[in-house]
Amino acid sequence: MQVFWFLPTHGDSRYLGTAEGARQVDQAYLQQVAVAADTLGYEGVLIPTGRSCEDPWIVAASLIPATRRLRFLVAVRPGLVAPTLAARMAATFDRLSQGRLLVNLVTGGDPGELAGDGLFLDHAQRYEASAEFIRIWRETLAASHEGAALDYTGRHLSVKGARVLFPPVQRPHPPVYFGGSSEAAHALAAEQVDTYLTWGEPPAAVAEKIADVRRRAARHGRTVRFGIRLHVIVRETEDAAWQAADTLISKLDDDTVARAQAAFRKMDSAGQQRMAALHANGIRRSRAELEISPNLWAGVGLVRGGAGTALVGDPHTVAARMREYADLGIDTFVLSGYPHLEEAYRFAELVFPLLPRAVRDTLPGSVLNGPFGEVIATGIVPRVAAS
């Protein structure tokens, strides 16, 4: 099991849907979150893309020297950059970070935003172009280790003599992550990506996705890893966690929710449609209605696009729910919480000790070098929680 955190390059706050409780998200703050994730033992951080975010590649590059082991899951969008240029960017980043790059292929699901970037392909065409993009990207980087060039002719993209002179550290290329809920997305994932990501749906729905991608991958003689993108609201007690969930959306008003849902309805993303269905396009608002599966809460999706669900509960409950997903085949958890700095610490302190031994063994610290807590009475080193 791998646990990732999230860099809030689109903003951060104590509440959703309001400027109240918001904080300045600048390089200094993003560095705080990244360094926290690095020192706490998260495998890496997801850095999102889109017009609502800071540029992920520039943000990630700025954080290389501030971190030691943290991996960067950086989004790339086909159509905004040539696949060969994206390959050179990835190779350079991987070399400068000494092999810490992961690439998140993002097709995009908002036709309005895509048109603003000069992309006018429909849903099916975007996935065709994305498949060609990532094939050129992968094969160009793989060829770079042998000093070879690539020729490729596709419907949307073609290259002749594509070459990367300085290969990435990772062979044959940095791992590729990708998420999507449509049939076209599953087909692309099965044929070309290393890890398929899903947004946080109830376990039965996630199991169906995993089974479908696995079947498709087997036809290509491939195996694919699986990850899930979730928010987390964990507190020392169940009641406190649900109170925190209520507080997170306590500033929302009907107009804000309605405007957000209207924007989501204009998207052609199958995943976004599935997220919206979990709360009936903003109609469901009570805790009972938003708890769509035990401890899985759809309140975040009332106003947030993309990942719209959170695991809510005490540490043991949240860890148990994660194990349920792991039993389905999920081995990568990409998590976040509001505000992201404090919640990175809270989740690590409360839940990491309850995760499988393989996760705990990778965490910083040991009996000799901490963490200990404050020394007691000038000479007693705390070892375990007080009973």
Swiss-Prot record:
Superkingdom as given in the UniProt entry: Bacteria
EC number: 1.14.14.5
A GO biological-process term: alkanesulfonate catabolic process
Swiss-Prot/TrEMBL catalytic activity: an alkanesulfonate + FMNH2 + O2 = an aldehyde + FMN + sulfite + H2O + 2 H(+)
GO molecular function, one term: alkanesulfonate monooxygenase activity
Function: Catalyzes the desulfonation of aliphatic sulfonates.
Name this polypeptide is given: Alkanesulfonate monooxygenase
Species of provenance: Ralstonia nicotianae (strain ATCC BAA-1114 / GMI1000) (Ralstonia solanacearum)
Gene, per the UniProt record: ssuD
